[in-house]
């Protein structure tokens, strides 16, 4: 098919997706997690050290905030949210950040941050919030087990993720808002653990967040883009990062069928441009196996093993199916 016809078809597809999302969004948002009230969290000082006393104090402060949010959710009549928050407040769980408002913002630590030589920060994509947090938690725990001793994983839900079917999922708006917070968070981790190797693992729309933050990520060694619809950048050089950029996609991931183009409208651009696993993008490709969109950190999967190898600073095994 001639290039101009193919591009025209991609533009029509994006416009159709935007119209469909605009119609569906009011329906899908009717029982939004953001509707559950929560108290304003107590201010926290920037993390400057990862010694046991500092971290224990931080974990205790966020636990108090979680319990307060749970009580407010119970008074609101949301028993499911209240129960979930009681579970998050258990002493065995450790949060560097917590804000229960507007769907939730959290940063949960898996592993011992005081001794971590490798730190992986998971940046999730669409439809991740306090009511659907279990998947991010399970993925983080699986990666921590795969990495073994000397590693910590942080599940960073530091922004309001878009709904999968919504206009916000087709633009960089939410990512632009999230990027400064991600930059500050990685800077704090580096200050607290200056010798640790930090990697960002960016799933789906999370890869757009990582891309928008990339120029300011001074302390990050690796950016891993997986299940990515694109980044909003035309290639790796446009990310303006010193980090090594990796990209992988499972063979059963539906995101492969997303139009990899960007359509500029008068007041907004929709779509995220070139496919990060394409050779022309310039990322280092890794074999992400045969899984689907939510399977990358599934225990025993090739994608989990290769992502863990990248976090550890070693080369992934196998040959990318998109090379």
Model-predicted regions and their roles:
Residues 1-135, 310-323:
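Flexible, membrane-associating and regulatory peripheral segments of lipid-active enzymes
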Residues 122-123, 201, 248:
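Short hydrophobic segments within beta-strands
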Residues 61, 97-100, 207, 288, ...:
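Intrinsically disordered, low-complexity regions enriched in small/polar residues
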Residues 31-35, 113, 126-129, 134-141, ...:
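Lipolytic serine-hydrolase domain surface
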Residues 211-215:
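Short, hydrophobic alpha-helix immediately C-terminal to the catalytic nucleophile
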Residues 95, 204-205, 220, 227:
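Mixed-charge, polar/low-complexity N-terminal
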Residues 201-210:
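Gly/Ala-rich beta-loop-alpha elbow adjacent to hydrolase catalytic centers
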Residues 118-120, 197-199, 222:
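Structural motif
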């Amino acid at each position: 098919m001639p290039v101009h016809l193919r591009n025209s078809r991609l533009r029509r597809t994006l416009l159709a997706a935007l119209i469909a999302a605009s119609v569906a969004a009011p329906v899908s948002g009717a029982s939004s997690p953001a509707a559950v009230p929560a108290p304003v969290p107590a201010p926290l000082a920037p993390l400057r050290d990862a010694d046991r006393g500092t971290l224990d104090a931080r974990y205790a402060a966020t636990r108090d905030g979680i319990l307060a949010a749970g009580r407010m959710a119970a008074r609101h009549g949301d028993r499911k949210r209240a129960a979930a928050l009681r579970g998050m407040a258990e002493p065995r769980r450790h949060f560097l950040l917590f804000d229960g408002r507007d769907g939730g913002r959290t940063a949960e630590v898996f592993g011992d941050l005081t001794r971590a030589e490798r730190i992986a920060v998971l940046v999730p994509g669409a439809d991740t919030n306090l009511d659907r947090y279990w998947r991010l938690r399970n993925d983080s725990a699986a990666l921590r087990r795969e990495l073994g001793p000397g590693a910590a994983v942080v599940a960073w839900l530091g922004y309001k993720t878009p709904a999968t079917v919504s206009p916000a999922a087709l633009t960089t708006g939410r990512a632009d808002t999230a990027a400064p917070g991600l930059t500050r968070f990685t800077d704090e981790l580096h200050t607290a653990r200056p010798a640790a190797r930090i990697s960002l693992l960016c799933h789906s729309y999370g890869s757009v967040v990582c891309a928008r933050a990339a120029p300011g990520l001074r302390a990050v060694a690796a950016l891993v883009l997986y299940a990515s619809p694109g980044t909003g950048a035309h290639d790796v050089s446009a990310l303006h990062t010193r980090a090594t950029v990796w990209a992988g996609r499972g063979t059963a991931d539906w995101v492969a069928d997303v139009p990899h183009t960007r359509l500029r409208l008068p007041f907004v651009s929709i779509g995220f441009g070139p496919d990060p696993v394409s050779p022309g993008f310039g990322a280092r490709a890794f074999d992400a196996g045969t899984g689907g969109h939510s399977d990358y950190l599934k225990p025993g999967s090739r994608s989990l093993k290769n992502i863990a190898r990248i976090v550890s600073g070693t080369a992934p095994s196998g040959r990318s199916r998109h090379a």
